[in-house]
């Protein structure tokens, strides 16, 4: 995993602790067999255009992003045993349920990735 943070293009920090998948196994595992994310955590899965919560015990919020990190779709509180997808996305940010409203993330917003030093 690669660790970093996501900001809006105006430098407003969105998520301080983001893990980005770096290989196939990390993408396949996702959040399976893990504790729920906290408000300030996220998992960025790339490349990815669909997500499932099969086998998970908790709901998550999803942010589908294109290659330029523009939000193309959001999904609120995807419950366990469900699937969500977006043909326009190349990566997905998984967040704790109810994070979208707190972070004020909406379609069309531009994000930026920053590696941890």
What are these regions (language model features)?
Residues 1-117:
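Compact, glycine-rich, soluble single-domain proteins
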């Amino acid at each position: 995993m690669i660790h970093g943070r996501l900001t809006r293009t105006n430098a407003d920090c969105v998520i301080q602790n983001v893990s980005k998948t770096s290989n196939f196994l990390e993408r396949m595992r996702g959040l399976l067999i893990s504790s729920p994310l906290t408000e300030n955590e996220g998992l960025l899965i790339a490349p990815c255009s669909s997500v499932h919560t099969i086998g998970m015990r908790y709901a998550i919020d999803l942010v589908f992003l294109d290659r330029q990190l523009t939000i193309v779709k959001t999904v609120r509180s995807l419950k366990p045993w469900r699937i969500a997808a977006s043909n326009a996305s190349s990566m997905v940010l998984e967040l704790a349920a109810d994070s979208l409203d707190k972070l004020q993330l909406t379609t069309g917003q531009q994000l930026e990735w920053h590696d941890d030093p």
